[in-house]
Amino acid sequence: MATSMFAKARKRLRRAAKHLEIDPDVLEKLKYPQETLAASLMVRMDDGSRRSFKAWRCRYDDTRGPTKGGIRYHPKVNIDEVMTLAFWMTFKCAVVNLPYGGAKGGINVDSKNLSRAELERLSRAYVKAFARFIGPDRDIPAPDLYTNAMV
């Protein structure tokens, strides 16, 4: 069985920690995301049918402030990728001293095959599903792979 991206990221953290003076409690906290959420987004398509899309939002760590990270629309996105990218976003914000923690979201969809109206309904369904977790003082979503200004 292949090693997950998230397992590889955690392994890099353990290796780096050996060369740094990191409090063991901090290292323990960084092993897993603070919060990972999943939803099935039901969207009415232009032809009247309904389709379900898997979606995720991972808030990795908010020690430095509200979490922030993009929402990826891609047919191969999965929970492992979302958690891994949220993990790395945590460190990217810390390295440049931004007052944010890391987060990432994803929807398993080939957005190129959706009409503008379907894409809008999908985006609204995502926000509705995760609305109680999103906000300027908690989690700040942003565009990512296969998104555009409309999304």
Describe the role of every protein-language-model region:
Residues 1-151:
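N-terminal ligand-binding/catalytic initiation module
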